[in-house]
């Protein structure tokens, strides 16, 4: 079973973590015991585009780090022979800033937010404290399995 990550870099930023992201997607499939291959669309964007998307779909006029949109095709996964879980928009400018703020490596921050975005596609959220703990525990377990550490 091969999971498919469709990457669209809509910036001039030289993105270096596709292999790491593919490993994360593979680990997610194992974690959720998926029987069909996963397919995910990933867009690397900047502050301007993510702010526009956030305003249009969430009515929030601000930049954010990651936005996740579940797939309309999820109900058709058996007919398609794969599970298209959705689309993620990852703001590289915010990722770089947050890596510095949290004293994380750039790889860690990119991987953490990518994983966080996927977990949202599975219906998890962090509005309530108990939900946030559960969501973060899943993300951290994926980071540990792939030996992606917090520090530089």
UniProtKB/Swiss-Prot annotation:
Binds 1 zinc ion. Signal peptide: none annotated. Pfam families: YbeY. GO terms for biological process: rRNA processing. Its cofactor is Zn(2+). One of its GO terms (cellular component) is cytoplasm. Single strand-specific metallo-endoribonuclease involved in late-stage 70S ribosome quality control and in maturation of the 3' terminus of the 16S rRNA. This is Endoribonuclease YbeY. It comes from Mycoplasma mobile (strain ATCC 43663 / 163K / NCTC 11711) (Mesomycoplasma mobile). The lineage of its organism: Bacteria, Bacillati, Mycoplasmatota, Mycoplasmoidales, Metamycoplasmataceae. The gene is ybeY.
């Amino acid at each position: 079973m091969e999971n498919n990550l469709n990457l669209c870099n809509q910036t001039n930023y030289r993105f270096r973590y596709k292999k790491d992201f593919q490993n994360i997607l593979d680990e997610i499939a194992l974690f959720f015991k998926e029987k069909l291959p996963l397919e995910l669309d990933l867009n690397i964007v900047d502050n301007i585009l993510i702010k526009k998307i956030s305003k249009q779909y969430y009515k929030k006029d601000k930049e954010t780090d990651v936005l996740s949109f579940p797939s309309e095709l999820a109900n058709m996964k058996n007919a398609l022979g794969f599970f298209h879980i959705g689309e993620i928009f990852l703001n590289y400018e915010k990722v770089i800033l947050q890596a510095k703020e949290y004293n994380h490596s750039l790889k860690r921050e990119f991987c953490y937010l990518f994983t966080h975005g996927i977990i949202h596609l599975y219906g998890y959220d962090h509005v309530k404290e108990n939900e946030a703990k559960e969501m973060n525990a899943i993300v951290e377990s994926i980071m540990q399995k792939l030996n992606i550490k917090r520090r530089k």
